[in-house]
């Protein structure tokens, strides 16, 4: 069994902020597995970054996908000296020393991240699994790499007020799991009363 460092062993007030190479090195050195988030730049390079937008972590405007990788190098993570890392560089650094949980950040129906990142992961020699809030990403893996352990992320979207509509009702209640057939579900632990979460337990 492994304990995992969420976005690396990080502290956003230090020189090892979330999803940084420094935070990942600290996790490896401490013997923790690593959970990280990947998405594509404008020039289709997988980078490790949680939010779709730059504002919270980098103080910048726009989204990751609005910038090329080189353009993103102008930004620093949480006022540290760390910059947004390439997924490929993280894989090379970890080098199978600890297991990875790779969250695929997929907006709407754009699945272009999946084949690009999957090519890198198939060449990777370490232990890993994938997960995503977007069931289309989980389904892509069911179809194209069914032997890989895949997870469906979910949350009480409607309770948090920021999200409304049929789509978030479907996601909150895991209504597409019968199609995507995830190997595990990771649900926001702050909402134990949600029926779909209870059923999964």
Predicted regions and their residues:
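Phosphate-group recognition and catalysis centered on beta-loop-alpha active-site segments
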Residues: 1-201
């Amino acid at each position: 069994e492994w304990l995992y460092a969420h976005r690396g062993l990080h502290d956003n007030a230090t020189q090892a902020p979330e999803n940084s190479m420094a935070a990942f090195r600290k996790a490896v050195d401490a013997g923790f597995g690593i959970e990280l988030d990947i998405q594509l730049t404008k020039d289709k390079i997988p980078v490790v970054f949680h939010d779709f937008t730059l504002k919270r972590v980098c103080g910048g405007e726009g989204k990751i996908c609005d910038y090329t990788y080189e353009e993103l190098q102008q930004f620093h993570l949480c006022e540290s000296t760390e910059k947004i890392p390439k997924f490929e560089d993280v894989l090379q650094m970890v080098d199978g020393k600890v297991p990875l949980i790779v969250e695929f950040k997929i907006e709407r129906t754009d699945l272009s991240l999946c084949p690009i990142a999957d090519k890198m992961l198939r060449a990777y020699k370490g232990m890993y699994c994938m997960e995503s809030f977007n069931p289309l990403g989980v389904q892509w893996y069911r179809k194209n790499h069914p032997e890989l352990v895949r997870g469906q992320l979910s949350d009480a979207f409607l309770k948090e007020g920021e999200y409304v509509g049929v789509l978030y009702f479907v996601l909150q209640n895991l209504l597409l799991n019968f199609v995507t057939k995830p190997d595990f579900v990771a649900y926001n632990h702050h909402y134990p009363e949600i029926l779909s979460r209870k059923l999964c337990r």
